[in-house]
Amino acid sequence: MSRLFSPASIGQVSLKNRIIVPPMCQYSAENGMPTAWHNAHYMNLALSGVSLVIVEASAVVPEGRITHKDLGLWNDEQMVAMQKMLSDIRHFSNARLGVQIAHAGRKASTELPWLGGKSIHPTQPNGWQTVAPSAIAFGENAIPHALTIDEILQVKQQFIDAAIRAEKAGFDVIEIHAAHGYLLHEFLSPASNLRQDEYGGCFKGRTRLLTNIFHEMREIINPNVAIGVRISATDWLESGWNVPESIELTELLEDLGCDYVHVSSGGLSTEQQIPLSPNYQVPLAQAIHENTMMPVIAVGLITEPLQAEAIVATHQADFVAIGRGILFEPRWPWRAASELNEQIDVAPQYRRCAPHQFKHLFK
């Protein structure tokens, strides 16, 4: 059996293979609730043959949205809508379902990407006041409000409340978004966190909010639900968050009972220098994988089945996340199975579609 199609687990959640769909914002929600677009989109992904689909960043508060069209889990109406979506998917797919909970921080209040994606001033329609650990703008965005201690404690509770709703909605996996320059990442990085109190300064201070959120969340959420964290392993800045700090953070999270770490990079600064190329983030995942017993997910320009197989077969990571590639090619796992001489589960409605040369592809 190929390594890519071997079963594995994250926490107590069993997965049928090592292929994961990462969170990818669709910017198509209404008042934070999934729409017909989400229902079709996630059903399609769940029928692709992957083991886990992670629903896009869902804001823990309205002002934590990237755009006004983001999903949310800040109220029970959204929870019920998510629950209905998951129930419909599970009628036809055995894929595990997760959700990423997030706060966009100083990168919130922006226009839809296909309308330019620019920052929207708080006084303009679909705009609001952004927040951050320090009053430092992202690029040319509006200057954020620096959170007070009381407001930081509120953010912590908002993440925990969103996780409780995610559990009630029926998600198998909860992912805390601490990457890509959003609020929790802003606290981690010395390039965006200039605080002089207990939430800034040294490594312990900058990681305090994330580790406190995780610790309290893990204590209250059923252990049958896996909880992981997505991080940017480096800011790609000389003065920013870096790989050694990511390794140290991973060790802290592992001690607190974290079930996996999802390793991305960048997003904090417009000055970042990212060396884009196939597998460009895999060495980051490998560096963390070598220093933890937790499962590690690699992501970023992983596009070919043999490439993905090599990553997991050589223990650079335990799982691969296929993002834009699976949007372009929604049956990517089918192609991977055919190229690796594996069989793959499909919905019975699709069993007759296998080409003659792959007549044994489907289980």
Protein language model regions, located:
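Flavin-dependent oxidoreductase catalytic cores
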Residues: 1-363
